[in-house]
């Protein structure tokens, strides 16, 4: 069947079978003589056949460029002379086919089949020849599997190469078509529109990532201009390995910021003008004469030491004077007596004052109603007189004078009414003021709550109960979310055995038992008695008994502030005047005991020590040790007489060098003796009193 198609740049089938094969790039294009295409009668093109021919031509080109290909060299002109794909393959004999087969299998196993050599491997094309050659032999499935695997890899690499080339071509076509569309749009836009030509817009390209480091970094010349030359000079002379180059110690500090400055940045201190002192003048001191006369009175500086004479001092008289002073001081009214009774001005208040211990008790609740503390609530109440309590307000000195006490005492700088507000040194803050009670507060009586009663005989107006109010009648969202199924439903019961909690997972037979504190603590304490402070060891080493107030490990109960408690027993109270009020008991100090121990490692040549000890035991002369010829004689010598270890140690002090003799100790010498006893077959025998060791030769 013949058809007529326009021939404008299309492919034309060769007229004769002997004509040479031309690739699409080198095939000549017909030149049309007229603008109208000419229709010719010719047979239809076989597109599939042309596609195969193009593939084979590319295979041959890659084969010629690959040096590892087993194919023979064929010129492109000779390779394009055939019409069928089989005629384009190189003619190989059986030996070359087997070599080519082994090469393909080797490349497949080493995974070295790439796009460069995939088109030069003809394992797929010679598959039929290989099967014909193997027909006579038994079928080897291992060889067949390897052949199929290598063929699949070769074909896959070829497909990937063709796919990549096609995408390259498509990318180039897209760019060219876009460029042609832009030129066409510009031609259409540049038409005659009022005789004006639109300016061409340029697209600005922005780079989000800068790849040139020179545009980011500053040049070296710009950096050098900002560096202080004085700093460069100081840094060049700085040596980190010497004390002369300590750089920071030479810097100056300015102002309170403690900022270090170089010499060029240091600001000089501002100096103020010196003020001239006023000129001396005379003044009238007649008014000050009376004051000077009072200061010149001959009064003793210390009345208690007025009769003291440095060269005539008597210890007995001094002790009598001190005892008289102590008795006089004890009888004085200014002495603080802890056993004194409470003054009459203090009267127990009707209601206890809330202190820091009752801070957690709610309002309206009496602390005495809580458990067993109700019995002892009297000891925790503060005694004060509310009626006579005078509040300190803003005023002048006359107002403050009213607060002073009429009777002087050690702690009576203020009146007892003012001191009642003071809770002790532990509670240094004053209590807040209490509001003055009015008549309305006293007359206020708590009304009893009316009991709710329901009368079924009365006529009830339901409109009053069911009227609309401003209050919300629906539940809020938070209430609805809290009352969900999860909060009102118990968790699933897994029937877990609680006994497994006390068992170990890896050792189920072992059970964990909980030991109580009483079992583990009370048992050893029962056997321990009270400590005897009068034992000879403590009395000989001076262990003074401290007062109860100096002990921080008191096991007694907490009694609270002393000013707030009542009903204390006299057993827990102490007499502060046992040592005198102004005396302080010195703390117990541990005696410093010097312990001699080796603070540095001692260096000892053990070989030299062994040789010297053996020569001393064998009674060899000292000059014989240094002679190399007599070494064997020294080793072969034996101990003839019994010797004592103490005498051997003293003899080593003379034979060893001074440094080794100083570092030699009895343990080192005895360790060396044990080594010699093992090597020389010596016998060591101790004395009855364990004072020394006898050394003798064992038979």
Swiss-Prot record:
Post-translational modification, as annotated: Phosphorylated by CDK1. Its phosphorylation, as well as that of XCAP-D2 and XCAP-G subunits, activates the condensin complex and is required for chromosome condensation.
Alphabetically ordered keywords of this record: Cell cycle, Cell division, Chromosome, Cytoplasm, DNA condensation, Mitosis, Nucleus, Phosphoprotein
Annotated GO MF terms: chromatin binding
One GO term describing the cellular component: condensin complex
Pfam families in the record: Cnd2
Region (Disordered): 1-35, 176-203
Zinc as UniProt keyword: no
Matching PANTHER family: CONDENSIN COMPLEX SUBUNIT 2 (PTHR13108:SF9)
Family recorded in the similarity comment: Belongs to the CND2 (condensin subunit 2) family.
Function: Regulatory subunit of the condensin complex, a complex required for conversion of interphase chromatin into mitotic-like condense chromosomes. The condensin complex probably introduces positive supercoils into relaxed DNA in the presence of type I topoisomerases and converts nicked DNA into positive knotted forms in the presence of type II topoisomerase.
Designated name of the protein: Condensin complex subunit 2
UniProt organism field: Xenopus laevis
Lineage: Eukaryota, Metazoa, Chordata, Craniata, Vertebrata
Gene: ncaph
């Amino acid at each position: 069947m013949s058809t007529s198609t326009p021939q404008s740049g299309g492919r034309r089938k060769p007229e004769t079978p002997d004509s040479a094969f031309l690739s699409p790039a080198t095939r000549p294009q017909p030149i049309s003589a007229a603008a109208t295409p000419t229709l010719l009668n010719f047979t239809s093109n076989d597109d599939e056949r042309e596609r195969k021919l193009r593939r084979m031509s590319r295979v041959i080109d890659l084969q010629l460029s690959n040096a590892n290909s087993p194919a023979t060299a064929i010129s492109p002109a000779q390779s394009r002379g055939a019409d069928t794909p089989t005629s384009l393959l190189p003619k190989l004999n059986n030996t070359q086919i087997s070599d080519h087969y082994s090469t393909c299998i080797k490349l497949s196993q080493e995974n070295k089949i790439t796009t460069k050599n995939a088109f030069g491997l003809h394992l797929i094309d010679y598959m039929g020849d290989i099967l014909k050659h193997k027909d006579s032999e038994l079928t080897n499935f291992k060889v067949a599997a390897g052949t199929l695997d290598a063929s699949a890899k070769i074909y896959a690499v070829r497909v990937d190469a063709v796919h990549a080339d096609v995408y390259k071509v498509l990318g180039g076509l897209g760019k060219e078509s876009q460029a042609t569309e832009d030129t066409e749009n510009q031609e259409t836009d540049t038409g005659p529109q009022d005789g004006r030509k639109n300016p061409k817009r340029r697209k600005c390209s922005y780079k989000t990532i800068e790849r040139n480091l020179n545009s980011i970094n500053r040049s070296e010349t710009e950096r050098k201009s900002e560096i202080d030359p004085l700093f460069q000079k100081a840094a060049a002379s700085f040596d980190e390995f010497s004390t002369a180059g300590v750089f920071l110690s030479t810097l100056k500090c300015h102002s309170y910021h403690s900022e270090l400055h170089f010499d060029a940045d240091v600001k000089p201190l501002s100096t103020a003008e010196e003020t001239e002192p006023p000129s001396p003048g005379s003044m009238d001191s007649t008014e000050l004469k009376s004051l000077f006369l009072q200061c010149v009175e001959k009064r003793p500086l210390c009345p208690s030491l007025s009769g003291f004479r440095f060269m005539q001092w008597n210890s007995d008289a001094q002790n009598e004077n001190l005892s008289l002073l102590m008795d006089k001081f004890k009888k004085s009214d200014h002495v603080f007596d802890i056993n004194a009774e409470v003054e009459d001005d203090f009267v127990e208040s009707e209601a206890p004052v809330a202190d820091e211990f009752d801070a957690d008790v709610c309002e309206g609740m009496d602390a005495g109603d809580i458990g067993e503390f109700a019995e002892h609530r009297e000891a925790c109440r503060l005694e004060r007189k509310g009626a006579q309590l005078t509040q300190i307000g803003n005023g002048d000195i006359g107002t403050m004078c009213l607060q002073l006490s009429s009777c002087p005492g050690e702690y009576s700088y203020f009146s007892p009414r003012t001191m009642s507000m003071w809770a002790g040194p532990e509670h240094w803050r004053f209590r807040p003021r209490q509001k003055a009670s009015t008549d309305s507060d006293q007359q206020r009586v708590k009304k009893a709550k009316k009991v709710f009663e329901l009368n079924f005989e009365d006529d009830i107006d339901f409109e009053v109960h069911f009227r609309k109010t401003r209050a919300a009648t629906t539940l809020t969202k938070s209430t609805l979310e809290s009352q969900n199924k999860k909060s009102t439903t118990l968790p699933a019961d897994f029937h877990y055995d609680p006994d497994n909690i006390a068992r170990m997972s890896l050792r189920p037979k072992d059970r964990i038992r909980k030991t109580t504190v009483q079992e583990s603590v009370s048992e050893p304490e029962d056997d321990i008695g009270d400590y005897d402070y009068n034992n000879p060891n403590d009395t000989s080493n001076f262990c003074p008994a401290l007062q109860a107030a100096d002990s921080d490990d008191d096991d007694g109960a907490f009694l609270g502030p002393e000013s707030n408690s009542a009903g204390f027993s006299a057993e827990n109270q102490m007499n502060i005047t046992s040592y005198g009020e102004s005396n302080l008991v010195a703390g117990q100090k541990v005696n410093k005991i010097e312990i001699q121990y080796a603070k540095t490692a001692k260096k000892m040549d053990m070989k030299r020590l062994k040789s010297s000890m053996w020569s001393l035991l064998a009674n060899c002369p000292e000059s014989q040790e240094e002679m190399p010829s007599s070494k064997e004689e020294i080793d072969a010598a034996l101990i003839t007489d019994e010797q004592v270890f103490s005498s051997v140690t003293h003899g080593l002090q003379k034979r060893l060098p001074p440094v080794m003799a100083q570092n030699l100790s009895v343990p080192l010498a005895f360790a060396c003796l044990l080594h010699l006893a093992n090597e020389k077959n010596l016998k060591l025998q101790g004395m009855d009193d364990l004072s020394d060791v006898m050394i003798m030769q064992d038979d």
